[in-house]
Regions:
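Long, positively charged binding patches that form subdomain-scale interaction surfaces
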Residues: 154-263
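C-terminal structured interaction module
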Residues: 260-277
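Histidine (H) residue identity feature
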Residues: 66, 105, 143, 193, ...
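Extended, low-hydrophobicity segments enriched in charged/polar residues
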Residues: 2-191, 201
Length: 277
């Protein structure tokens, strides 16, 4: 079952102005501009750009990942692309790995697939026996119980370039700072929400990251089936990580239906990999 709605369209000028104003409250240096998209193949992506017929999709959710009755659920994002009229597309985003493709392991998935040329640049990260992070190529065209995917024709067009340096505010997450900047400065009301997606690099500095361990290694109850959400921490954290990281992000300021779509509560999903190793 697929439920659909439309996000409100704002001009790139309004979006960039909102980001410039809002992000300046959290970072020492902020430069937001509208530019021609660089050739993303130079960034190791399987497509040149991220423009044309843009759609985002929120697949599954926490119950499909953590409810014992639903663990192991898998979704074919190539089949989903056909259902939404994006079968010839570049798909990027963040999700969980399909356990059937990982010998039963859990994994954090960077979705990076060209469904036009069949090129795959996806990466999976999982927790090893000694709690080390293992990152490797992933070529399956399906993901696990949740995924946030951006579908586009993959052509080059105008994009918003954001350059930031030096955090001065309390918000530690760039994507959450972006969501707040958009909400505050676009003065969103009446469910006139906006969604953005794209690729960014961490050139300097380090970040805190996590990978979901295998279910058998989580020794406590962390999911409440009545609330249909996780109520205790269960992730394996790694810090500091970086720099030279490439991130793939889908974010939105809210549900354009007012809540009927039951979108991911965080309002964003971002996964990354090293671009030098």
């Amino acid at each position: 079952k697929i439920e659909k709605s439309k996000f409100k369209e704002y001009s790139l000028d309004r979006i960039s102005d909102a980001l410039q104003s809002g992000l300046s409250n959290n970072y020492k240096l902020v430069e937001v501009s509208i530019v021609d998209c660089p050739n993303l193949r130079d960034w190791g992506c399987p497509s040149e750009g991220i423009s044309g017929n843009q759609k985002i999709i929120d697949v599954g959710g926490e119950p499909y990942m953590h409810d014992p009755k639903l663990i192991g659920a898998e979704f074919d994002y190539e089949e989903i692309s056909k259902m939404i009229g994006s079968e010839k597309s570049y798909a990027l985003g963040a999700g969980s790995g399909a356990m059937s493709c990982l010998d039963g392991h859990c994994g954090e998935l960077v979705i990076n697939e060209n469904l036009i040329t069949d090129e795959s640049k996806s990466i999976i990260a999982r927790v090893g026996k000694n709690k080390e992070c293992i990152a490797e190529k992933y070529t399956a065209r399906k993901h696990g119980g949740l995924g946030n995917v951006f579908y586009t024709d993959g052509v080059r067009g105008k994009v918003i370039k954001i350059k930031i340096k030096g955090r001065s505010g309390e918000q530690g997450s760039l994507t959450q700072a972006m969501r707040k900047a958009l909400s505050d400065n676009l003065k969103i009301k009446d469910n006139g929400h906006i969604a953005l997606a794209g690729v960014f690099r961490i050139l300097n500095g380090k970040i805190r990251s996590h990978v979901q361990p295998d279910y058998k290694d989580i020794k406590h109850e962390y999911y409440d089936p009545e609330q249909m959400k996780c109520v205790k921490d269960f992730l394996q954290f790694y810090e500091p990580v970086g720099p030279e990281l490439q991130s793939y992000c889908v974010l939105w300021t809210g549900d354009p239906t007012g809540g009927n779509l039951n979108l991911r509560e965080s309002g964003e999903h971002t996964h990354f990999h090293s671009y030098t190793k």
